Amino acid sequence: MTYEEGPGDAYFAVDPAHRGLLPEMVDHALTHLRHDGKVRLMVSDWDRDLQRIVHSRGLRATDGRDGNSVLDLTEPLEYAAPDGYRVISLADDGDAHGFNRLLWRGFGHPGDAPETPEQLEWRRLSMTGGPGQVPELNIAVVAPDGEYAAYCGVWHDPRTDYALVEPVCTDPDHRLRGCGRAAVLEALRRCAARGATTAYVGSNQLFYYAMGFAPYETGTWWV
């Protein structure tokens, strides 16, 4: 059981051999993961046992959903970068300023990206310094003017046969040109070369379906 950005949201992962822990995990989330007195639980729509447990604790399903999609990496992963754009890895060019600007703009923040020493150091760590980070797998698409246009981060442990796509963004000035597609598929090509046969992304956006991802599993927020 964990949360992503802070207490208030709870996600569950349990080994099939230890599903008897689920009631205790739910109770722990309800007691210890609240924020301002509130907590919501992400429950897989396929997990009837967990649904029954959270329902018995007085929670009810909402219309808030969380989709996931899957891609077969044994199939060809074809893309073409837009004319004048280059596809690189963060091992080739670790421009923290450009990376910071892209993620700021790509995820819809207004104005200029903050460039305090603390912000840039955090970006540097998120580019190459995190546990499990493989800079050669994390792909940026560079525009003709040298600015980062799109980015795809992926996570792959060579002891496993799957990859996780996260995060992905494109600068608003470079959308609808194939930059995001190029970043994602190049990153996944590299994962496939390391032995990954499947890729997952926590999204059900048409952007992913257009490159071959298919709906895999959905979850619902319970409160």
Predicted regions and their residues:
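Short amphipathic alpha-helix that is part of the acyltransferase structural core
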Residues: 80-117, 145
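Conserved acetyl-CoA-binding loop-helix of GNAT-fold acetyltransferases
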Residues: 19-31, 170-172, 176-193, 210
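A conserved beta-strand-loop-helix scaffold within acyl/acetyltransferase catalytic domains
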Residues: 2-7, 110-169
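Acyl-donor-binding surface of acyltransferase catalytic domains
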Residues: 5-85, 89-91, 221-223
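Conserved hydrophobic beta-strand within the GNAT/NAT acetyltransferase core sheet
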Residues: 39-42, 165, 198-203
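Conserved active-site tyrosine of GNAT-family acetyltransferases
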Residues: 52-55, 208-209, 213
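A structural microfeature
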Residues: 1-2, 62-65, 150, 180, ...
